[in-house]
Amino acid sequence: MSTSALRSILRPSFAGRVSAYGRRTMATGAAKKEWLAIMPDKANVLEIRKKVKPIHYEGIKPLIASGTLPAGGAIFEKHPVDGEPAQFKGSIVVYSAETAEEVREIIKNDVYATSGVWDLEKVQILPYVAAVREPLTK
């Protein structure tokens, strides 16, 4: 057997398992896609947001652990400054799900939605493909 033939046997092949965007895909189950969700806050909901924030964080832990919520956070009118109250504008989240409808259901069940923080009529769910993923700190 030639050296090149032996190398091709020993070298792992990702052919057929990597999409055009460099993401590994699996042959079983429906393919999940990423969605960018923008959830604006309703007016004058800062106190409600603060009150339910711990419940929100507990509620998203399973979504993070399962990979359904790989990234997310608050959006602001301007960057927060120490000593000044933050001017929240809403939330932005990347979800991994099969459909936009699945994402909408996750959003509707979040405590920020059920307590009236997010304006569900103005939620945007957009198809999303990440080109770069880097941790905040290295």
Place the predicted regions along the sequence by residue.
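Conserved, structured core segments of small domains
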Residues: 2, 15-138
